[in-house]
UniProtKB/Swiss-Prot annotation:
Functional description taken from the UniProt entry: Associates with the EF-Tu.GDP complex and induces the exchange of GDP to GTP. It remains bound to the aminoacyl-tRNA.EF-Tu.GTP complex up to the GTP hydrolysis stage on the ribosome.
Protein name per UniProt: Elongation factor Ts
Broad class of the protein's primary localization: cytoplasm
Keywords, comma-separated and alphabetical: Cytoplasm, Elongation factor, Protein biosynthesis
Amino acid sequence: MSKINLEDLKSLSKETSAGLVHCKQALSEAHGDLTRAREILKELGHAVSVKKANRGARDGVVGALSSGKFGVILELNCETDFVARNEKFQQFAQSVLEAACAAKVKSVEECLSTPLPGGQKVRDAIVEQVAVFRENIVLSRCVTYEVSQSGLLGVYVHNKYTENLGKIGVAVAVVSEADPSFLSTVAKDIAIQVMSECPCAIDVARIPPNLLESEKHKYNLEVEGKPASVAEKIIAGKLSKFYKKVVLLEQPLFSDPERSVKQYISDKEMESSAKIDVVWYEVFVLGEAS
């Protein structure tokens, strides 16, 4: 076996994040040639990636990041909480998140093809991380949105590991001429509302038709045999309760249940002398897509 230079061993491990044992094996096989050792580690990473590709990856992190008018929310999965909490895994997830935001990707595929700061594509970097952590790693979801008008995109992360990584991520787009710093607070409040109360639509008009029809059908069955005027009032009351449960603007405000979200926004409009519209939101809960 060729004698291994300890400095090269440390350097290779730091550069690739691979374990010392694998770096030592690679350097030995490469007869001390660092360039060849890097190639061997990449080949090892690919082999391990193929081997582990069918293993379930349901842990990991959800990341959310905004550059102002553009934001990204993604989920990077691994197999265990042990790896999800690993600082190097989180640093890798953060680098993917930042690259996706900077490149304004529009899909998982675009994100996988995006280069990281060193020039390596996310897809290839994931293969290397599989070799490092010996777990299957998958970029399972990536959604982005850009505010084209005046306004911004705010994000909120719950059960945080870091500022941008956690177990739940929310992104909210608001359109307004209000001061950006003021609007940022509004967007965060709305994001917390979305995370806490899980609405299915921003307003009544955007409730999925099949869901609304299903509710109406259920209420109609419940009032069968009652006078039309009575049935109409009962259905109206039930729909009102339903809207308060599933429609963002109709929900009681999480931080102040005496007000609805709609009233909160109205108050903020008066405070800023500017109209504020919530135009989009997305929420990712770790593992829900598995």
